[in-house]
Regions:
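Catalytic beta/alpha-barrel core
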Residues: 73-77, 103-104, 124-126, 165-166, ...
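Short beta-strand/loop segments at the ligand-binding rim of alpha/beta enzyme cores
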Residues: 43-50, 96-101, 217-227, 268-283, ...
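Active-site-adjacent beta->alpha loops and helix N-cap segments on the catalytic face
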Residues: 30, 79-88, 146-150, 171, ...
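Catalytic cores of alpha/beta
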Residues: 60-63, 236-244, 283-301, 341, ...
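Alpha/beta catalytic cores of nucleotide-metabolism and tRNA/nucleoside-modifying enzymes
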Residues: 1-24, 104-105, 167, 174-177, ...
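Bateman/CBS regulatory modules and CBS-like beta-alpha motifs in cytosolic regions of diverse proteins
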Residues: 30-44, 51-53, 82-120, 127-129, ...
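Short beta->alpha transition motifs characteristic of CBS
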Residues: 74-79, 122, 126, 133-149, ...
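Glycine-rich phosphate-binding active-site loops on the catalytic face of alpha/beta enzymes
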Residues: 67-82, 246-258, 297-315, 345-379
Length: 492
């Protein structure tokens, strides 16, 4: 037996190795359906998930992507309390009817009210007594010109007697009519006993009309996921995230096909049976089967394809991303478990290829790291604006808490860490909306060429393998680019 026959078990192809073959189409790009599943019980309006990276997704990014129809995964490089707080910010960013509104106790001060408004980015707070009975409401208009920070809010609030309220049987449409009729912005929901049980705001109703494709839960709140590692406090972190309202938990490791991850997944499903748990990362069908058997509600595919990942050169391990996605998709066929293709995406065409190979959604990092909503630092270099972007396997990220992702949580000495990623910078790209608009536009175009009316139909598309000459031919060539396109930059 030769080495090739004995040891090479598969061909490894990635996005630049193939093109999709155009097919007969009756599908216009503007009519395609981009809805898909993130996990077994969470639907998305667009197939985009922002990565659980400390220079990509915190509350601001998660809110922005959910408003566009995707979902964000808040990273874990922070304390349990801070990550739970980030989740809570997303869940409170928009609501249909708010059934657990932020409140302030009677007797609190103007300073207390201003601090709460700043923390939760809200413009008004119901005032309650110690038993939870509504006694008034205080808004930023009440506090705008107030100079005495120690003054009790009872002296500046609008008392209950002057408030318009409603009961819990009022639906959202009726609530909107009440708000309009009385020209008010906040409508408290009060029980028969006088206790505050909820709140409807004009701002939330307006947001719902402005972003009809937003990814929301049954209560009208934006959906959000949160990442955890495999450590001694994993279940404690998960409990805090679930309590804060997280819609899904992502067990995020460099090697999802390991005994430690599978055991932690089983423990998590037993303790939290009502929440979807996504697990990654993996690169083989065998790994997918093991995770599904252990209870995974979705799997995340990608070992080493990311622009800031060095796993393949440091460890010599990985599977080119397109082949990995296809291998996992084959293994998952008939299970109903969605596949998230994570990493290696440079252009919208790569997104089309990832979904055509069997993905339900794609996880994006570098494509959105340069946006206004990312938490990365802004850098000016040679007169141009950039944002910092680093792999969770970079030395800097590992020092801040991601060591466990690479099974190095027991290494205390920074000099003994073995990084599997780098720190970098990416060009500033404006708002997330602008980037997502171009990505969805390219995806719609690709689906139109393939005659695929939805993502499920896109899974039937066929590929042609191309040479390096084919790759060169695919990019602009034999010219000097004089005007940059918003969705294309020449590969370095």
């Amino acid at each position: 037996m030769s080495f090739i026959a004995d040891k090479i078990v598969m061909d490894g192809l990635t996005y630049d190795d193939v093109l999709l073959i155009p097919a007969y189409s009756e599908v216009l790009p503007r009519t395609v359906d981009l809805s898909t599943k993130f996990s077994q019980n969470i639907e998305l309006k667009i197939p985009f998930v922002t990565a659980a990276m400390d220079t990509v997704t915190e509350a601001k990014m998660a809110i922005a992507i959910a408003r566009e129809g995707g979902i964000g995964v808040i990273h874990k490089n922070m304390s349990i309390e801070e990550q739970a707080r980030q989740v809570a910010i997303v869940k409170r960013a928009e609501n249909g009817m708010i059934y657990d509104p932020v409140t302030i106790k009677r007797g609190s001060t103007v300073r207390d009210a201003l601090d709460i408004m700043a923390e939760y980015k809200i413009g008004g707070i119901p005032v309650v007594d110690d038993e939870g009975y509504l006694v008034g409401i205080v808004t930023n208009r009440d506090l705008r010109f107030e100079r005495d920070m120690a003054k009790h809010i009872d002296l500046v609030m609008t008392p209950k007697e002057r408030l318009v309220t409603t009961n819990q049987s009022t639906d959202l449409e009726s609530a909107a009519q009440i708000l309009q009729k009385h020209k008010i912005e906040k409508l408290p929901i009060v029980g028969m006993d006088g206790k505050l049980i909820g709140l409807v705001t004009y701002k939330d109703i307006t947001k719902a009309k402005d972003k009809p494709m937003a990814c929301k839960d049954a209560k009208g709140r934006l959906r959000v996921a949160a990442g955890v590692g495999v450590t001694v406090d994993t279940l404690d972190r998960m409990q805090a995230l679930v309590d804060a309202g997280a819609d899904a938990i992502v067990i995020d490791t460099a090697h999802g096909h390991s005994a430690f991850v599978i055991e932690k997944l089983r423990e998590a499903k037993k303790r939290f049976p009502g929440i979807d748990i996504v697990v990654g990362n993996i690169a083989t069908g065998e790994a997918a089967k093991a995770l599904v058997e252990a209870g995974a509600d979705a799997v995340k595919v990608g070992i080493g394809p990311g622009s800031i990942c060095t796993t393949r050169v440091v460890a010599g391990v990985g599977v080119p991303q397109l082949s990995a996605v296809y291998d996992v998709a084959k293994a998952l066929k008939g299970t109903g478990i969605p596949l998230i293709a994570d990493g290696g995406l440079r252009y919208s065409g790569d997104v089309v290829k990832a979904l055509a190979a069997g993905g339900y959604s794609v996880m994006i990092g570098s494509l959105v790291a340069g946006t206004e909503e990312s938490p990365g630092d802004t850098i000016i270099f040679n007169g141009r604006k950039f944002k910092s972007y680093r792999g969770m396997g970079s030395l800097e990220a590992m020092e801040n808490g991601s060591k466990d992702r690479y099974f190095q949580s027991g290494t205390a000495d920074v000099k003994k860490l073995v990084p599997e990623g780098i720190a970098a910078r990416v060009p500033y790209k404006g708002t997330l909306f602008e980037v997502v608009y171009q990505l969805t536009g390219g995806l719609r175009a690709g689906m139109g060429y393939c005659g695929a009316a939805n993502i499920e139909k896109l899974h039937d598309a066929k590929f042609t393998r191309i040479t390096n000459a084919g790759v060169m031919e695919s990019h602009p060539h034999d010219v000097t680019i004089t005007s940059e396109s918003p969705n294309y930059s020449r590969p370095e």
